[in-house]
């Protein structure tokens, strides 16, 4: 059970880290757009952009998970 959750979380973070889409903010269309609160899409976009900076740590985490799969979760 815990092994499945670790694999699920690892795959989810990997998918977010390797996205190569151009994630840009929407251009402001008029007056008053600067004062609005960030939307959910903006928050997701910022999170995915921040994941790109942690690719080295994500790679190390993958190696750790592979080690755990062999040593701890293997039969």
Swiss-Prot record:
Membrane-spanning intervals of the chain: 54-74
Disulphide linkage map: none
Signal peptide extent: 1-17
Topology in the lipid bilayer: Single-pass type I membrane protein
Extracellular membrane side: 18-53
Keywords assigned by UniProt, alphabetized: Membrane, Signal, Transmembrane, Transmembrane helix
Keyword Transmembrane helix: yes
Compartments reported by the entry: Membrane
Cellular component terms per the entry's GO annotation: membrane
Domain of life: Eukaryota
Ranges in the topological domain labelled Cytoplasmic: 75
Family (UniProt): Belongs to the SMIM7 family.
Protein name: Small integral membrane protein 7
Organism from which the protein derives: Siniperca chuatsi
């Amino acid at each position: 059970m815990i092994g499945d959750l670790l694999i699920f979380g690892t795959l989810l973070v990997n998918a977010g880290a390797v996205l190569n889409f151009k994630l840009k903010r929407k251009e402001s269309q008029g007056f008053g757009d600067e004062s609005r609160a960030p939307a959910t899409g903006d928050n997701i976009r910022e999170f995915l952009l921040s994941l790109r900076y942690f690719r080295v740590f994500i790679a190390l985490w993958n190696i750790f998970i592979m080690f755990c799969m062999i040593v701890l979760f293997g039969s």
